[in-house]
Amino acid sequence: MQTYDNPDVKYEWWAGNARFADLSGQFIGAHVAHAALIVFWAGAFTLFEISYFDPTLPMGEQNLILLPHLATLGLGIEGNGAINTEPYFVIGAIHLISSAVLAAGGLFHVLRGPQDLKTATGPARRFHFDWEDPKQLGLILGHHLLLLGLGAFLLVAKAMYFGGLYDTATQTVRLVTEPTLDPAVIYGYQTHFATVDNLEDIVGGHIYVGVLLVAGGIWHILVPPLQWAKKVLLFSGEAILSYSLGAIALAGFVAAYFCAVNTTAYPVEFYGPVLDVKLSIVPYFADTIELPMNEHTSRAWLANAHFFFAFFFLQGHLWHALRAMGFDFRRVEKVLSDPLDA
């Protein structure tokens, strides 16, 4: 992390993973523990939503954010359109159990594993990294891309072979047996991606994304960063963090818009009607139907949450990018605190 030439910087607990920036073993432990928290939240919140779900009311008008996703995946949808929450309970329980396994892994890396993988033996040593080592950072990036590609292919497998997805056009759960593979169709969505209106194109797009992610993962594992990349990019903990935050911000803004207007990936039956864009102190997405006071559709909750989280991630990206380039924010504080010359 940026220390401004001070080798003895001490980070408090609130600095998060900055405390472990130079301890690759502890860094992995922190990431596994973070994954445990995410999975625990998903499981616990799924069970919480089940506890107040009312099958007599539209799902999109019950302040739900996780059950609509599960329903969109074709889970819990009976032949007559009724919702069976038993699969949701099973999924929530599996997430809770998985979070315990991940938490145990995090504790192992923190308490029993080597603090620095440089001292590890066996395959673990391969994942030691230094922030100034582009080759090793590329290898770690490659493994991340492989996992993301696997996630894309899991959705494809669910759509094509394991029960299918919910199709809002027919209001049924069906297998997607002929996903779109025409590159002209897939890449034709570049300027209007949120207008996609059929499952075949969505699943075909995930096939393309999965192939690109896996190919990119293999490339980065085998091929070190090229010279042009080394010249253009900064390789440091602060810079890598800024790149990650920028990517998450972009994904958040895209997800917010997609959720707000698309009714194929986000069916009206589960998320409520499309939203309007409003402008107050800040931009926001507003419901287009009348609801009781302080009630919002699932679409409104998700779109606005993604938008505002993306906004703050963008601020984090800019903050850490400037620090990575050497800008010292303490200078701003000093200038503001000094009295103006008479």
Curated annotation (Swiss-Prot):
Regulation: induction: By iron stress.
TM segment ranges: 27-47, 63-83, 88-108, 202-222, 239-259, 302-322
Primary location group: membrane
Signal peptide: none
InterPro entries listed in its UniProt record: PS_antenna-like (IPR000932), PS_II_antenna-like_sf (IPR036001)
GO CC, any one term: plasma membrane-derived thylakoid membrane
Keywords associated with the record: Chlorophyll, Chromophore, Membrane, Photosynthesis, Photosystem I, Stress response, Thylakoid, Transmembrane, Transmembrane helix
UniProt cross-references to Pfam families, sorted A to Z: PSII
Note on cofactor: Chlorophyll a.
GO BP: photosynthetic electron transport chain
Cofactor: chlorophyll a; all-trans-beta-carotene
Molecular function GO terms recorded: chlorophyll binding
Topological relation to the membrane, as annotated: Multi-pass membrane protein
Function: Functions as an antenna for photosystem I (PSI) under iron-limiting conditions, when phycobilisomes disappear. In the (PSI)3(Isi3)18 complex most of the harvested energy is probably used by PSI; in other PSI-containing supercomplexes a large part of the energy will probably not be used for light harvesting, but rather is dissipated to protect the organism from light damage.
Family membership: Belongs to the PsbB/PsbC family. IsiA/Pcb subfamily.
Record protein name field: Iron stress-induced chlorophyll-binding protein
Species whose genome carries this gene: Picosynechococcus sp. (strain ATCC 27264 / PCC 7002 / PR-6) (Agmenellum quadruplicatum)
Gene from which the chain derives: isiA
